[in-house]
Amino acid sequence: MMVPQQGAVVKLDALAFAYPGGQAMRFDLLVPASEIVALMGPSGSGKSTLLNLIAGFERPDSGQVLIGSGDVTRLPPFKRPVSMIFQENNLFSHLTVEQNVGLGRSPTLRLSDGDRAAVSEAIARTGLAGKEQRLPRQLSGGERQRVALARVLVRRQPVLLLDEPFASLGPALRDEMLDLVAELHRDQQMTVIMATHDPRDAERLSNRLLFIENGTIAADGATSSFLAGQGPPAFARYLGERKRLR
């Protein structure tokens, strides 16, 4: 049985970054251990960049990324105590469900008996029992994201980053996946930072919302307050534009 764990504090201290020829971005952020935070904002505002800076896929020009008690600013992604799920490309197409989940324990898939037990438990926990030997192409979109969540379970990292992983799913399946994330959070108490364009995602999963605009955190507050119209005018305009596009 998986032992309960605790999330880690995530702190971005004067973190500066710019793509070549792009706008300068700056992030200052403190996320307490085990909190769930939603990131919302226009496309290109910096949501994915913020997540990639935490995960280590982008290197800041200056500033620090702190996770728990450690400075991880210069660490490569595989050495950071972070798991991340994207909208696509979470799985290796030539590996089975069991193998894709097993990568969370060992990149060489040399698994101990304890590792195999953890993989089996995670597969069952995410509703994939009986599909261990299937390839990703034999799964539905929702099932593929369940495999990604199962891999998160066996990695047992204190921080989970979600970059619109359920955006391509229909409303019912999307809600089901968000509920599964919430259930895993209750058990493992990991810190969760989720980028989304859908206010329903934020409302369902998080109590705190950050509005990202022009490469910075433009507003930070309770999700309920933002969605009740108490956020900045720019957030209301953003939601209005999203509704027009749907």
Curated annotation (Swiss-Prot):
Q: How does it assemble?
A: The complex is composed of two ATP-binding proteins (ThiQ), two transmembrane proteins (ThiP) and a solute-binding protein (ThiB).
Any one of the GO CC terms: plasma membrane
Membrane topology, as annotated: Peripheral membrane protein
EC top class, as a word: translocase
State the Pfam families in the record: ABC_tran
**What's the protein name?**
Thiamine import ATP-binding protein ThiQ
The similarity comment for this entry is:
Belongs to the ABC transporter superfamily. Thiamine importer (TC 3.A.1.19.1) family.
Could you tell me which species this protein originates from?
Answer: Chelativorans sp. (strain BNC1)
Which SUPFAM superfamilies does the record match to this protein?
P-loop containing nucleoside triphosphate hydrolases (SSF52540)
What are the protein's GO molecular function terms?
Answer: ABC-type thiamine transporter activity; ATP binding; ATP hydrolysis activity
Domain named ABC transporter is located at 10-239
What is the role of this chain? Part of the ABC transporter complex ThiBPQ involved in thiamine import. Responsible for energy coupling to the transport system.
Q: Output the SMART domains linked to this UniProt entry.
A: AAA
Localization, per the record, is: Cell inner membrane
Q: Which UniProt keywords apply?
A: ATP-binding, Cell inner membrane, Cell membrane, Membrane, Nucleotide-binding, Translocase, Transport
Q: Check the record and name the PANTHER family matching this protein.
A: SPERMIDINE/PUTRESCINE IMPORT ATP-BINDING PROTEIN POTA, THIAMINE IMPORT ATP-BINDING PROTEIN THIQ
